[in-house]
């Protein structure tokens, strides 16, 4: 729609795994939920859920779900599920793969794409964004502790899954590993400095994903987690803040904040900022607000100057668009939006207020920086041009 603004799109989903137990779908709002526990290990970045569940027909199961996004290799997300029937033998059908049925509150930013099974049982989805035509490849490989009695690929509308059937004896534990990777045309290896868009060639992106997914055959969930946990250990050794308090929640709260400060920034890419919701959801459409400089920049300046430089570089990239907007508004300086996304793109949509004035969620900002070595050596144009008049 003409008045919509750029937003951070949700990419195809690899998290969903469907379990059919003796013909009945596992769902916590059906049957009997006997116990549930969810934890996040801040030291390793691994999330775990443990569930005890009884189907409407009476089959009891224990399930343990584990997942993480790798800090060692940003392309990788891995999942592990253990299923144990505790009171009877069962037939278990697992549907797991890649889905493009997800959306941003109803807006689907990716086309349905091309689905293919590669050698070794690797599922691949090739798609691209609707407007900017950014190519995206998603790969996943499943590993099982027991061989399925039946295995076949299933292609549905906007979903590509493998369907695997197992017969488990009472007390037998089946372990499922799902190893996945994402690549896009905006990835740094495909991007020449100064060009935000990267490549629109899907073959290049697919080849990168194919090469990484092929390595999954020689590794597994535990090895990938160990590599990621090693990077987390280095982070905590450098950045941990210890609090003396009678309430242990104070220490937990501090480390939870540090955890998010580590995952919400891409230190090697100044084309992206930090969304107002960080990595917790799609609120504010993934736009960066002045909260970044007000609340987050001091932390990075003190603990990680290279990350702070990246965030400043992100703002610097938006200056050409801000100056153009200033010209459109009859200002001699730059007109910086309250909420910012990609440089040169429209950020904040207009709202018609009851007072009768047309209001935009943006303000002209004018700051003067003195004795700033960063500005002198990197971008003097960041010095704001004071307007000769104000509207």
Question: For each predicted feature, which ranges?
Answer:
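Acidic/polar, glycine-enriched structural segments that form the non-catalytic walls/loops
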Residues: 1-284
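A conserved hydrophobic secondary-structure block that centers on an alpha-helix together
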Residues: 58, 71-72, 384-391
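Substrate-binding groove/exosite segments of carbohydrate-active enzymes
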Residues: 224-390
């Amino acid at each position: 729609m003409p008045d919509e603004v750029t937003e951070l799109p949700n990419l195809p989903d690899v998290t969903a795994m469907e379990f059919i137990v003796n013909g009945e779908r596992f769902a916590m709002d059906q049957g009997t939920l006997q116990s549930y526990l969810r934890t996040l290990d801040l030291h390793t970045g691994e999330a775990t859920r443990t569930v005890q569940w009884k189907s409407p027909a009476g089959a009891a199961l224990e399930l343990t779900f584990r997942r993480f996004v790798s800090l060692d290799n940003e392309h990788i997300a891995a999942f592990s599920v253990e299923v144990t029937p505790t009171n009877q033998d069962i037939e278990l059908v697992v549907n797991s793969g890649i889905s493009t049925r997800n959306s941003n509150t109803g807006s689907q930013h990716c086309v349905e794409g091309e689905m293919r099974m590669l050698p070794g049982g690797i599922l691949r989805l090739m798609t691209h964004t609707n407007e900017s035509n950014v190519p995206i490849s998603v790969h996943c490989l499943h590993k099982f502790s027991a061989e399925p009695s039946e295995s076949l690929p299933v292609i549905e509308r906007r979903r590509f899954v493998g369907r695997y059937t197992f017969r488990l004896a009472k007390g037998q534990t089946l372990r499922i590993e799902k190893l996945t990777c994402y690549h896009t045309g905006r990835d740094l290896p495909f991007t020449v400095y100064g060009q935000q868009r990267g490549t629109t060639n899907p073959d290049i992106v697919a080849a990168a994903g194919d090469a990484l997914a092929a390595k999954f055959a020689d590794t597994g969930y535990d090895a990938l987690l160990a590599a990621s946990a090693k990077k987390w250990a280095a982070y905590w050794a450098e950045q941990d803040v210890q609090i003396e308090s009678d309430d242990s929640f104070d220490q937990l709260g501090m480390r939870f904040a540090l955890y998010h400060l580590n995952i919400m920034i891409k230190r090697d890419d100044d084309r992206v900022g930090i969304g107002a919701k960080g990595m917790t959801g799609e609120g504010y459409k993934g736009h960066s607000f002045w909260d970044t400089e007000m609340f987050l920049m001091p932390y990075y300046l003190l603990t990680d100057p290279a990350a702070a430089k990246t965030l400043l570089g992100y703002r610097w990239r938006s200056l050409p668009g801000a100056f153009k907007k200033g010209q459109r508004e009859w200002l001699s300086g730059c007109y910086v939006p309250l909420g910012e996304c990609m440089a040169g793109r429209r950020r904040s949509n207009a709202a018609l207020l009851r007072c009768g004035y047309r209001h935009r969620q943006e303000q002209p900002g004018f700051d003067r920086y003195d004795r700033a070595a960063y500005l002198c050596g990197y971008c003097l144009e960041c010095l704001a041009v004071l307007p000769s008049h104000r509207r």
